[in-house]
From Swiss-Prot:
Similarity comment: Belongs to the nuclear hormone receptor family. NR2 subfamily.
Domain of life: Eukaryota
Biased composition (Polar residues): 41-51
CDD domains in the record: NR_DBD_RXR (cd06956)
Protein name (database record): Protein ultraspiracle homolog
Chain residue ranges for the region called Hinge: 185-192
Subunit structure: Heterodimer of USP and ECR. Only the heterodimer is capable of high-affinity binding to ecdysone.
Annotated keywords: DNA-binding, Metal-binding, Nucleus, Receptor, Transcription, Transcription regulation, Zinc, Zinc-finger
This protein's encoding gene: USP
UniProt remark on domains: Composed of three domains: a modulating N-terminal domain, a DNA-binding domain and a C-terminal ligand-binding domain.
Segments for region (Modulating): 1-112
Organism (species): Manduca sexta (Tobacco hawkmoth)
Record GO cellular component, one term: nucleus
GO-annotated molecular function: nuclear steroid receptor activity; sequence-specific DNA binding; zinc ion binding
């Protein structure tokens, strides 16, 4: 009984703390005046993985890795899948550069994915494969999807380029021995096992497991907004306009992908359309910055993690999108050094110190999106229920997987006020330099929710 009381007290106190430290995003007219004497040529809100953007970048300002236009695996820490009820395997591809931490369930894995060469999470449909390729093959078979190759049907499929050509990826799955009938048999077994089961409530369907599935399956949208742009009235100096314009185009694509991700969250699409628009409108900047901070953990060197060092240099690289980084010197010259340092020091470094994993990351993303304090919501109680469900899921996951770390649940949530503060500073740059189109972002979100491709049917996974 005492343990239950302790849990409730901790959850409520942290929730109240977050709510008090979570001001609403000010209206654009309140963000116009930012004292600054330095020009800015860098846009922060670039985040979710995407396929090759059709833009040309000014590489003088960016550090481009080989094949940077190809998606890479998510960074670093993965969820302790043994602690997730109903989820036996890791739900996202392994990290791009780092090994698993010693306590990770897959740290001793000796197998690589037969399709892309990433770390395999087990044998799926007859072949050792990662969760990314497993999910791709399962979705292709169950939806009976067909693909076309834009090249010569011999595209390279590795962990950085596996999303570039779906046709060649599927053909390689078959060539490596993945069996279509195994997917169909799995679905039949699942159907038999649920014949006598009671239908779950809407709240029960929202879980970390489902969010992990969405994170690994969400596709790149076919088009992007034209929300961020360098117009004739922009205050960006002429010599910086080309790289800023390129980054704006990439940023627009990332915002479009974010809308697709949000729409696929269980029951988000059942909210009033106006509520969906308001929730995305008030969280997109935070979500994109959070994704940048998450990916940038890979680029933090070991020297900066040495607590005994007294002359530790600040982090030098920020990952804007898979394979594309921005150096601190470029950020300083562009006039956004403060935002650069805050994202890495207040978010990335703290997240790495906490050893935040993928399950915690996706849960926090949903918590950021499902903010019942947004003004104008038509069905606030339903948003409250969904967000409280995510609080409970995260708290339960932390207690099971990190039971020895007292206060971890609070430590995770306390990254959110810092994220909100940084996002407001980023907004100041966007509006001060007139990088936001005159039309409200709500119209772009509305079009994306109404016109983009059908969402992922996770109920059949």
């Amino acid at each position: 009984m005492s343990s239950v009381a302790k849990k409730d007290k901790r959850t409520m106190s942290v929730t109240a703390l977050i709510n008090r430290a979570w001001p609403l995003t000010p209206a654009p007219h309140q963000q116009q005046s930012m004292p600054s004497s330095q020009p800015s040529n860098f846009l922060q809100p670039l985040a979710t993985p995407s396929t090759t953007p059709s833009v040309e970048l000014d590489i003088q300002w960016l550090n481009i890795e080989p094949g940077f236009m190809s998606p890479m695996s998510p960074p670093e820490m993965k969820p302790d899948t043994a602690m997730l009820d109903g989820l036996r395997d890791d739900s996202t591809p392994p990290p791009a550069f780092k090994n698993y931490p010693p306590n990770h369930p897959l740290s001793g894995s000796k197998h690589l994915c037969s399709i892309c060469g990433d770390r395999a999470s087990g044998k799926h449909y007859g072949v050792y494969s990662c969760e990314g390729c497993k999910g791709f093959f399962k979705r292709t078979v169950r939806k009976d999807l067909t693909y076309a190759c834009r090249e010569d049907r011999n595209c390279i499929i590795d962990k950085r380029q596996r999303n570039r050509c779906q046709y060649c990826r599927y053909q390689k799955c078959l060539a490596c021995g993945m069996k279509r009938e195994a997917v169909q048999e799995e679905r039949q077994r699942a159907a038999r096992g649920t014949e006598d089961a009671h239908p779950s409530s809407s709240v029960q369907e929202l879980s970390i497991e489902r969010l992990l599935e969405i994170e690994s399956l969400v596709a790149d949208p076919p088009e992007e907004f034209q929300f961020l742009r360098v117009g004739p009235e922009s205050g960006v100096p002429a010599k910086y306009r080309a790289p800023v314009s390129s980054l704006c185009q990439i940023g627009n694509k990332q915002i479009a992908a974010l809308v697709v991700w949000a729409r696929d969250i269980p029951h988000f699409g059942q909210l009033e359309l106006e509520d969906q628009i308001l929730l995305i409108k008030n969280s997109w900047n935070e979500l994109l910055l959070f994704a940048i901070a998450w990916r940038s953990m890979e680029y933090l060197t070991d020297e900066r993690e040495n607590v005994d060092s007294r002359s530790t240099a600040p982090p030098q690289l920020m990952c804007l999108m898979p394979g594309m980084t921005l150096h601190r010197n470029s950020a300083l010259q562009a006039g956004v050094g403060q935002i650069f340092d805050r994202v890495l020091s207040e978010l990335s470094l703290k997240m790495r110190t906490l050893r935040m994993d993928q399950a915690e990351y996706v849960a926090l993303k949903a918590i950021i999106l499902l903010n019942p304090d947004v003004k104008g919501l038509k069905n606030k109680p339903e948003v409250v229920v969904l967000r409280e469900k995510m609080f409970s899921c995260l708290d339960e996951y932390v207690r099971r997987s990190r039971c020895a770390e007292e206060g971890r649940f609070a430590a995770l949530l306390l990254r959110l006020p810092a994220l909100r503060s940084i996002s407001l500073k980023c907004f100041e740059h966007l509006y001060f330099f007139h990088l936001v189109a005159d039309t409200s972002i709500a119209s772009y979100i509305h079009d994306a929710l109404r016109n983009h491709a059908p969402s992922i049917d996770t109920s059949i996974l």
